[in-house]
């Protein structure tokens, strides 16, 4: 994010045709704009609003308002803090608020309501939000230019050939000398990984070329901005549809600014968020969700990075904690943890070799990106991937501080019938490896009936302290926060005289 921080000190001129007049930001306006206070809205995973608010308070020092419309938070910042907003890990999309109406009075008929939307466009305070949008746009342009320079340097090394081999030998030497795990080293030497790396570099170079070509054209030939209006509506007492509101409000915005409407290749996205009687007009600051990070090899049930971050925050990791995801899938949770909590060690495990392979590929890809960005060999990441059986983990008793995992829902993976055998066995094995008294577990599942039943039989080793209800791919799921009790683990064979009868994960 250093590119973004540097961009705040030097803005690019962008023509905004407001009432057929050009509004530009110059160096003389920079001081006043850096002190400008604006309201930023952010969409977050439904159910993790409070977690996102805590992150904003911790990293930006700003208090948050959680919207009545679930999945949104609002906070006030100065424009100079815009770079840090893009570094938030718990938010999906960002937008700057133009104006908020807490109790908007809708008329009785559709025609009257739509006419009010048309009149609203010319009454809104667009000036400051558009300045924020221009600063945000300058971030992307400067980032693309710097990215092209870095990638060209990487391309020269690749074409040279010898330097790449030297770099790889140096990386391998650094890895070996510091005793990093053998799994990452093996995958780094894997021909498939090398092919993925070269493909990644080629794609980035091509995209950078397109972006810089477009930016050079804009600098030489300023054009009228293209825009679209997106209406997000929730509530049953509205006499209009989302498309009707977007159409009429968008038409008024077009008449006011003389912009060109374009539903796909737009420069500005105007948001019209309606929830019951609450109406908020904003301008989008992100083109795609910020949860699209870290993962390059996807599986059938890849967890969103923002959800993974929210789950990790619930367990409050401390320095030097051992954090394990025993059913990691593509490794979204451990990878998110390794990037944000680098002073902990993260273990990603799964019984499926394909899942372990995806997780290892994602780890190697993230490491390679870090090396390309820094231009030198990396010390590695505090993470490892391993294949194991969740019901018989190759870990010492009481050796794990935190367990965070996404349990099989029984929908796309596994089955609800198998969960009745799997969940009790998982909780029992987790209680064995987790440290008594201080150990924590954060578990996500949609099969709440099965989990509640399994947990009721484990009350002597697990104590539930919180339940967070979230939306995962349209499914209502629960995140259970558990604390390991001081009760020492007792093997079932010592209780029943029968070894392993309750420890088998039945298929």
Curated annotation (Swiss-Prot):
Gene3D superfamilies given for it?
Answer: 3.30.2130.30, Vaccinia Virus protein VP39 (3.40.50.150)
Q: Which reaction does it catalyse?
A: guanosine(6) in tRNA + S-adenosyl-L-methionine = N(2)-methylguanosine(6) in tRNA + S-adenosyl-L-homocysteine + H(+); guanosine(7) in tRNA + S-adenosyl-L-methionine = N(2)-methylguanosine(7) in tRNA + S-adenosyl-L-homocysteine + H(+)
Family (UniProt): Belongs to the methyltransferase superfamily.
What this chain does, per the entry, is described as: Catalytic subunit of the THUMPD3-TRM112 methyltransferase complex, that specifically mediates the S-adenosyl-L-methionine-dependent N(2)-methylation of guanosine nucleotide at position 6 (m2G6) in tRNAs. This is one of the major tRNA (guanine-N(2))-methyltransferases. Also catalyzes the S-adenosyl-L-methionine-dependent N(2)-methylation of guanosine nucleotide at position 7 of tRNA(Trp).
Q: Assembly and partners?
A: Part of the heterodimeric THUMPD3-TRM112 methyltransferase complex; this complex forms an active tRNA methyltransferase, where TRMT112 acts as an activator of the catalytic subunit THUMPD3.
Protein's organism: Homo sapiens
Superkingdom assignment: Eukaryota
According to its UniProt record, where is this protein mainly located?
cytoplasm
Entry-linked Pfam families: THUMP, UPF0020
| Listed name of the protein | tRNA (guanine(6)-N(2))-methyltransferase THUMP3
Taken from the UniProt entry, a GO cellular component term is: cytoplasm
């Amino acid at each position: 994010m250093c590119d973004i921080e540097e961009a705040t000190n030097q803005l690019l001129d962008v023509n905004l045709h407001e009432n057929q007049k050009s509004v530009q930001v110059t160096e003389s306006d920079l001081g006043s704009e850096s002190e400008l206070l604006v309201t930023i809205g952010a969409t977050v995973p439904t159910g993790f609003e409070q977690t996102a608010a805590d992150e904003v308070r911790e990293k930006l020092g700003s208090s948050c308002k959680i919207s009545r419309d679930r999945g949104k938070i609002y906070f006030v910042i100065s424009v100079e803090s815009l770079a840090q907003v893009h570094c938030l890990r718990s938010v999906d999309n960002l937008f700057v608020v133009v104006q908020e109406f807490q109790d908007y009075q809708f008329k009785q008929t559709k025609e009257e309501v739509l006419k009010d939307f048309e009149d609203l466009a010319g009454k809104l305070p667009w000036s400051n939000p558009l300045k924020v949008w221009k600063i945000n746009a300058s971030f992307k342009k400067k980032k693309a230019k710097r990215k092209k320079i870095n990638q060209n340097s990487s391309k020269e090394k690749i074409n040279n050939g010898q330097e790449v081999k030297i770099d790889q030998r140096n990386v391998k030497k650094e890895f070996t000398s510091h005793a990093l795990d053998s799994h990452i080293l093996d995958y780094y030497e894997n021909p498939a990984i090398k092919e993925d790396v070269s493909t990644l570099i080629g794609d980035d170079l091509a995209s950078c070329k397109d972006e810089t070509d477009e930016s050079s054209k804009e600098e030489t030939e300023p054009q009228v901005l293209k825009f679209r209006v997106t209406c997000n509506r929730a509530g049953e007492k509205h006499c209009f549809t989302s498309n009707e509101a977007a159409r009429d409000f968008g038409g008024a915005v077009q008449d006011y600014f003389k912009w060109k409407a374009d539903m796909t290749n737009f420069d500005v996205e105007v948001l019209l968020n309606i929830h019951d009687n609450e109406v908020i007009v904003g301008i989008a600051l992100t083109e795609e969700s910020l949860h699209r990070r870290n993962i390059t090899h996807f599986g059938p049930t890849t967890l969103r990075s923002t959800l993974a971050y929210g789950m990790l925050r619930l367990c409050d990791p401390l320095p030097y904690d051992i954090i394990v995801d025993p059913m990691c899938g593509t490794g979204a949770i451990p990878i998110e943890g390794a990037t944000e909590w680098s002073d902990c060690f993260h273990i990603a495990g799964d019984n499926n070799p394909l899942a372990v392979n995806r997780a290892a590929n994602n780890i190697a890809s993230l490491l390679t990106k870090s090396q390309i960005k820094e231009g030198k060999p990396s010390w590695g990441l505090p993470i490892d991937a391993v294949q194991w059986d969740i019901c018989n983990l190759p870990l010492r008793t009481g050796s794990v501080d935190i367990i965070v995992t996404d349990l099989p829902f029984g929908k796309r993976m596994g089955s609800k019938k198998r969960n009745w055998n799997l969940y009790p066995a998982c909780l029992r094995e987790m209680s064995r490896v987790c440290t008594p008294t201080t150990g924590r577990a954060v578990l996500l599942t949609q099969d709440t009936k099965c989990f509640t039943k399994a947990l009721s039989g484990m009350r002597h080793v697990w104590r539930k302290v919180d339940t967070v209800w979230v939306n995962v791919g349209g499914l209502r799921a629960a995140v259970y926060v558990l604390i390991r009790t001081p009760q020492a683990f007792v093997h079932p064979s010592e209780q029943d005289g029968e070894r392993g009868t309750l420890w088998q994960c039945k298929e």
